[in-house]
Amino acid sequence: MSHGTSLDELFNSRDFIGRHIGPNADQTRAMLDAMGLDSIDQLIDLTVPASIRGEETRALAAPVNEQQALAELKNIAGNNQRFKSYIGMGYHPTYVPPVILRNVLENPGWYTAYTPYQPEIAQGRLEGLLNFQQMIIELTGMDMANASMLDEATAAAEAMAMAKRVARKNKSNTFFADKHCHPQTLAVLQTRASHFGFELVIGDITQDLNKQEVFGAITQYPGTSGEVKDLRPIVNQAHEQDALLIVAADILSLVLLESPGAMGADIVVGSNQRFGIPMGFGGPHAAFFGFREKYKRATPGRIIGVSVDTRGKRALRMAMQTREQHIRREKANSNICTSQVLLAVMSVFYAMYHGSAGVTRIAQRVHTLTKMLAQGLTAQGHKLAFDNYFDTLCVIVNDQQQGLFDRAQQAGVNLRKLDKNALTISLNECTSLEDIHQLLDIFSLGKHSQDVKSLETKALAAEVIPASCRREGPALNHPVFEQYHSETEMLRYLKRLESKDIALNHAMIPLGSCTMKLNATAEMIPVTWPEFGELHPFAPMEQAAGYSTLFTQLQDMLKACTGYDAISLQPNAGSQGEYAGLVAIRKYFEHLGQTERNICLIPASAHGTNPASAQMVEMKVVVVACDNLGNVDLNDLKAKVAQYGETIAALMVTYPSTHGVFEEEITAICDLIHSVGAQVYIDGANMNALVGLAAPGKFGGDVSHLNLHKTFCIPHGGGGPGMGPIGVKSHLAPFLAGHPVQPVPNTLVENGTISAAPWGSASILTISWMYIRMMGAEGMKRATEFAILNANYIAHRLQDHYPILYKGKNGYIAHECLLDLRPLKESSGITEEDIAKRLMDFGFHAPTMSFPVAGTLMIEPTESESQAELDRFCDAMIKIRQEASLVESGELPRDNNPLVNAPHTLDDALDETWTRPYTRDEATRPLPYLHAHKIWPTVNRIDNVYGDRNLICSCPSIESYTEE
């Protein structure tokens, strides 16, 4: 008798689990057999300490398939209301050119790449970022710019810290913030200043700056209520006391307004959102950061520079990396690791697509419509607070404020209440004549009858930007902004750049501690839904019921995965999550009256962001040693605890450790810290080895940040966006970050503000929601198990060729492993960099180099890679070891072999003469699979020293592009 298939199986609700996890059943069996294991359960029992095991993810709903998850989320999205928003405050409706939407934002060749630490296979993104820097340099009038920041408010806070670093002659500890800055910027400045130990004074900068002795000051240009004013008097007042003047500028206004740099500003920050990036209820967006060249070594963030490769060809790279957290740790200029690469390149492609004339036309249209609206409002008898404006009008309405606001709401329009007597209206790229008519109708209480078009002549004649503030000449002058105005040319340019880079759509990216797993297409689809993209972050919350549901459900999911009691979604990067967690700890101890606690214990193996974050909250970093097995040295930890006792605020520890092992004594470590009343911060960078097996909130953690762009499938975007929410135990929950504009449930404004938007980069939270919903408890656990299986399989295959530096007590690793290359360097002169570059010839991105131990490679394959891909990588690594053995034996010279000459380009392969002691095929196609498909690095090894000594961070002449 035959049996039918159950409906549960036919609906295939677990379908996605098998699509996300790489190895199939046969491959899994083969991998286990190779390691002499009976089952994955046996591997997990031998790897993960029993003392921390649990199954908290059982609280998750059962998995659903892709279609079901998309339908559920579409239903949630439908509860958001898409009003026309004229709120402004740094967020504006914009139009994403379809060629950029489809070929960048929706393209895995762009969104699945990693930060360009290996520049030879990242020349496309690097060119896009260099163009971005050029755009910011020209618009701001600064000498240099970095390759993006997280948002405008945190960029302003970073600028404040930078001002303190460089104003060495100035002994003041006071920073002045203009009250006309956006309120979210002021809130982030207040939070940062309080933990840096700065005094922050907020006032009217034109009247009060010269009453203070300050090391720096910031103003908004135009002001948050719309006024445009000459910056020169403010600049002069700041410079008279050796203080720096920071300007937070609106990027579209800079097309028509005189640049802050031309007026003497020292640092210029702002948001690129209105250059073709959806509002997304707060993000993600790229911020910009322009500065004077003399401050280049004090600036935060990535900087892209021009160098040369070994053939003398122009090549791009990340410059001056010694400023950054992964090298300088607590002495770094900033704790920022991820920036906003995907959004930065989208914004510059927007500028390149429109060109200087196009963006000028957009800015002039917005400005002209604003003048027409002003003419109509004044004709109705309304009074404007300012006569000088770009796109924002401040209308004095006195006791009519609430009535007009409500009338606008009834018409599907969002205005901004300013103080108690005014409403502001910020126009945007999407504003039409019909919108002007609607706004005039709202303000006339339905009595408006004037023909809107008739306002045009008078508006065109009106000069409302002061002569001293008008830009002379085009805003964008480099030829790169005049090359790609047709869709055909832009499409091909984007493809040319994409083809220069290795992303996950090419091959595994085995970067340790980075978790480059599958970013499934179904997870990405909702990101571009207008129901999520078109909401202003400060719109009334009743318009964002869908987002509220999304936040609540995702918080519950993350609580189930971590064992924590509360989740804050505000931090928009892992670095900001670390900062938010440490701020919560600080606030907690202030509440207890234990302000003497200022010691942060950090193991030597920690991520560089950990000490950099600790110093941002005025904690003193004390390093705890690691033992020969890679574990935290318990004896040294006990000694440090005895020495510092009740002055200890926190221990920051990554688990599993960055050495790639599950430390057996983690609960004892947590207990020891708790014994002196301190808090345990468990860095969530390696959560991909824990979800479904062990929860940090259950085995001793008080707070963790979660890299949603690692464990929970938000793509890395070539270096951003990311999201770094934090989970906390109940005693820390009252101290989570609030927001001054949009109240966050169960938080207080006085707790401080971490990011510009209340829920960070809200629109990409849909990705993690989709991932967890489609995986369910069963799938989340399986993902973790296969991450551990894949890593151990690689370690097993490579251990006879490279020493595995650290293993757990039973001889297994966690989800990543360290290959010790120091003996090889001693015997052959071959370095970890040589192997990293040689891997490019095999079509692979290198593992993480020299972290957490110098002279090593850290490999993390993730659960998404099949056995075939793991074998391909292992075959490449084994072949490289064989090549190195020829150097060891003297068959190949130390200074002329496939490793030290790597990577090999098409130019190398086509050289008319070949004088190297190995063949062209050995150079470029060292394994058979490369005969069928080959990814060519577009430049040879780049000269890092030359690039830093001859620092060029703007676009070369157009001739240098055509010469190539």
From Swiss-Prot:
Sample GO molecular function, one term: glycine dehydrogenase (decarboxylating) activity
Pfam families: GcvP2_C (PF21478), GDC-P (PF02347)
Enzyme Commission code: 1.4.4.2
Cofactor: pyridoxal 5'-phosphate
GO terms (BP aspect): glycine decarboxylation via glycine cleavage system
UniProt xrefs under SUPFAM superfamilies: PLP-dependent transferases
Catalytic reactions on record: N(6)-[(R)-lipoyl]-L-lysyl-[glycine-cleavage complex H protein] + glycine + H(+) = N(6)-[(R)-S(8)-aminomethyldihydrolipoyl]-L-lysyl-[glycine-cleavage complex H protein] + CO2
Keywords: Oxidoreductase, Pyridoxal phosphate
GO cellular component: cytosol; glycine cleavage complex
Family: Belongs to the GcvP family.
Functional description taken from the UniProt entry: The glycine cleavage system catalyzes the degradation of glycine. The P protein binds the alpha-amino group of glycine through its pyridoxal phosphate cofactor; CO(2) is released and the remaining methylamine moiety is then transferred to the lipoamide cofactor of the H protein.
Quaternary structure and interacting proteins, as annotated: The glycine cleavage system is composed of four proteins: P, T, L and H.
Protein's recorded name: Glycine dehydrogenase (decarboxylating)
Origin species: Saccharophagus degradans (strain 2-40 / ATCC 43961 / DSM 17024)
Chain's gene name: gcvP
